[in-house]
Amino acid sequence: MSRLWLTGYRSYELGVFGSQDPKLLVIKDTLKKLLIGKLENGMDWLITGGQLGVEQWAAEVGLALKPDYPELKIAMMTPFAEFGSNWNENNRGTYAQLASRVDFHQSVSEQPYHGPQQLRNYQEFMLTHTDEAVMVYDLEVEGKPKYDYEAITRFAEQHAYPLTLIDMDWLQESANEYQENSNNGSQFE
């Protein structure tokens, strides 16, 4: 069994607004290619959070891959109970719909948010229940994922825990490839 933690930027940090944003199509295509490679090398659990952005997109991509990779299991873990309750109705609905479709959905803490220790406990849980991490994160473009990056690198100093960073250069290369394939009439989902 191989378990992958996938996390990264929130949608607003990447300037992605709406499901038809060209940036989102490139990000999802990048995640799809990466996940297929991981699946073909033995990954069977995709474990992500519920944040708006990379985490929800990863769950969506994983769900789209399940027909071709029925062995894939997807877990959506959140740091605390009532996660996302302060979001607008549309975002809450998207989150609830995703949570109902994944194989496993649970909060690390059964309490509503009451402090940053819950977030640290979440990071510790994710690190000790996965075998590697992938982050859509660039060291030169800080954002909320900085805290997960720091936790992962500290953990990796003491444990064999690989981290793959999908940085802005990787995303730009993916965008160029996506555009080239679109111009050549290749089909992307």
Curated annotation (Swiss-Prot):
SUPFAM superfamilies: MCP/YpsA-like (SSF102405)
Gene3D superfamilies: 3.40.50.450
Family, as annotated: Belongs to the UPF0398 family.
NCBIfam families assigned to the protein according to its UniProt record, in alphabetical order: PRK13660.1 (NF010181)
Protein's name according to its UniProt entry: UPF0398 protein LVIS_0849
UniProt source species: Levilactobacillus brevis (strain ATCC 367 / BCRC 12310 / CIP 105137 / JCM 1170 / LMG 11437 / NCIMB 947 / NCTC 947)
